[in-house]
Swiss-Prot record:
Coiled coil: none annotated. Signal peptide: none annotated. SUPFAM superfamilies: Cysteine proteinases. Residues 74-162 are annotated as: Disordered. This is Uncharacterized protein CPn_0483/CP_0271/CPj0483/CpB0503. Residues 255-349 form the OTU domain.
Amino acid sequence: MIKKRAIFERMFPIPPPHCPPNNKNNFYHLTTDTKDPLLLRILRTIGYVLLHIITLGLLLLIHYYKHHRVVRKEGLPTPPTLPKGPEPKTIEIAKQPPKDGEDKKPDVPKPGTPPPEDTPPPPPKAPSPASPKVPKQPADKKPTPPPEAPPPPVRVATPMPLRPSSQGYWQCLNRMVSMVLRRAPLPLPAMQVDPILGDFNPHFVASYPNRIDNEPMYFQIKQFKKIAQNPDLPQQHRRLAQLSLEQALYLNDNYYLVNVPGDGNCFYRAYAVGWLSALYEESSRNDIVFEQEATRLLDLPFASSSPANANLCAEMAELLQLCSTYCSFIDLYDGVILSQKHTATLIAFLRKLSAYAIRQQIAASSNEETARALFISDMQDDLLPSVLEFLAANRPYSELFQNLIDHSALPYMQSRDKLFLLLEHLPALFLTDAELQKMSPEDQQLRKQYEREIREAFAKLSRRIADSGWDTERFNAIVKDYLPEAIRCQYSRFLATIENRRSGDLPWSPALSFFAFLCTCPSVRFHKLCATFYKSLEDIIIASAPPQRSIQEILQISNASLSYLNEDLDSSWQREVISSNIMTILTTHESLTLESSMPQLETLHKRIANLLKNVISTSFETPPLSNQPDLLSNLVNKLLVAIHSKLELKEHFNTVCSARSLRLTRDEGSGLSQEQDLLYTQAVQLLFFILQHPQVNNRPETKDAVKELKMLLLPFLQYAFKKVENEKKLQKLLRSILGSLVLKPPARYPSTPSNKDKETFCKFWSRHPEVMVLDPILEKNCMQFLRATFPNYQLETEAILLEKEIESTFRNGWNVFLTRLNLFGSKLGSPSSPTALSDQFSKSFLIFCFLNNYPKLLQKKTPLAARLDAFQREASHRFTQVKDKLLLSLKYGFPLATATINQYSRARDQLICNLLKNTVTASDGFCRSGFRQSLIGYLHSLSSNELGDILDDVKEQAEANDVAAMTTVPLQPFAVCLIMSDRDTVSEENIENFVAMHGFLNTISPERDARIFLIRFPNHYGCLLPRNPRTEDQNSKPDSSNP
């Protein structure tokens, strides 16, 4: 029996159980059919796992395309769905007169196709051209005969001529918000984040309208609730959170938010969105609103102010006409508001319009001088670097060189500021015998008379100081006897300088002399005793110089000596600017590492370092400082120990010491030992390190030693910068550096320059050939190209003849052009360029570059201009012919040259920002705003119209006056809402003024009167679109599909 059963089981095997045990699915496939090969069982298991993976992937793909599908970047948009036309039967019924007792309203369409809101049904007999055509009745069917009595007219709304079947504005707005809430596919310009890259979308123009509570980045409603309900927080914080919450809820109930890019044009972008939206909403009541707005634009005074503005208004009117042709608000939004081209037109129009309105307001309420001051005040915040770039690109170089580099005009000063300026440069008011002998006998007498008047004026001021309590006895007892030896030594050197410059016996008191010393070396004022004394005398001197009196009246200078007084004020200001600019360069971060890209910096640093070392060694090798041999060494060693105790400071200090300009060699003729020479070299290197890395002033391990060393060494540097004998040398050093700042190479080159980059360089080089000296390989290639190709016999012969006429006719421009070349190109007489750069070029190439810089000379109707024009056309043709050879020569080494040019551009930008920074006397006692004041003084020489043009070009974003100016423009009225949580604009003092208006400003337009609604976030604007109450309930809850 058992054998029969075994035979039966082998013939008919019992199948395995259909359901595996729980949690044993894979184990089931491995254990079932154990007689199968192991490989087969493993493949069966793998197939089972892959089946699960494929199934899960299909489910995820279906979910993605249902809820998270992304719109394509390219392709045609989905055409709008037009509403169905009325049925023929409905038209026949509409023609019949209503019977008594019946409602005279037309029949309502079926619920399946609701009519657009706020849009009347189309007229029965005159459907507009763009609406769907009504099907024709069969030819054999006769029309319904008219009734005997004429029926009363059926009231129907007049259709819009250009948008006959347009969908309602509120219906479209609701649909757009629903798309955002459902995460439906949106146009690419409406998405802030690129759906493919997952990064910021560079094509973003404006978002679709969204609910306020769906914008947590701007309205942190949950955070507001949490703070408002937290009893542990201060009352003012909870109140601010509660007010911010109430404002957010109010805005959420009444508005949708449209966000725009924060590129500086956010105000104009938001205004454009609100403007077009308001016009489209009004078009449901006024069919020709866009045409009326276009006509209003063309009638603005702005349209007739200039041809450019007239063209801009005409372009804007065409855009408004285009807006009137769209069939729905969504089409308008996608076609115009989300268009990069149309948005650029809107921004340009609104920017120019607001700028014109500002100018009209200033012209109507201010004179020319006040208008200039207003424009310049708008530039002084952060726009001065951009203003300088604009001037360098658009103004003649001769003007900039004369006003910013060669000679800085004395700015407007009050009488007391001029008096302090004279005291700061007191030794220079008295000439030496050698300087006096260079003058004519008559001028010598006038100069001596002027110096007598100056001595008498300061003697009178000394008596006033003594009468105020600071006589010689008190000064000696309180101040002089308690001065440190280092300050007393520097004060003695200051007095000796005055006596050596023909001042004779000082007729003024020691108190006034020491006050002038503190003005010359302001870092000494950081000594507590000196600071107290300076403040006491400063109040006395200010009281002696009332603002209503001129400096001539205060000092009682005669009219015969007035010219010398003005000369001294001007020369004192020049030295002030020189010392300020040099100190700014020395304190520019990493200026020592920029020496390789700007050779003039290395020369300046080396000259200053040698000057400082010589002054220090001379002072400490002669009495009275020679009597304290350990004074300097103790301070130097103390600071070196502190620096080497921190690895970070040690690395920075080693970088400073490795600069080529600070590798000071020992002068064998100085008589200094190696230990003394090393000490003075280390002192110079430490001072440069302090100036380059100001953080050591506050570090606990270095601040005490730094303070003492600066107190000891900085006065030497400050006094050297203002010494008359050093003025010309320092000015020569500065002219080369400041002159190079006007040279702005093209934009940053890539690491692998293309042929287009090479052509850009060639074009720039034809105007600024001095740029080639930045890189030795580039300079070599360019000079080889010039020697081999450009000197043409005919051109060179003509150039030699033209050079003499150009020099005599356009002397100023020609000299400035050569000066610019040689300032930047000569590298201050370094061995690599012993001769001037202009002498290394052929005459034909030199005149070719000169005319590229001054193309207006070719437009004059003179015989010389005709010859220059013919020469320039021939030279340009020659340069274009041989340019390929230059491009070929740039094939090798150009990437390295562009890296050097990029490094120079970075150094240039850094220096410009520091030179134009608004600073006062800092912790080191230097005022670094000389170049800034020179630029502002030059701007005051321009007209208000020129300043307005500059401001319009460099302004990066809409300022408060731009927003206020738009209220005077006869367009749609707009309101601005400030969010309560912005602490920069809404303070605790004025927050009550915004509570009643929910943050809206009454100073612009009240909320109830506005058609355009803007909201201001911290440094950003957005647009608010009013919600339709009939669709409010529909969007009050987020869609269930929204995750």
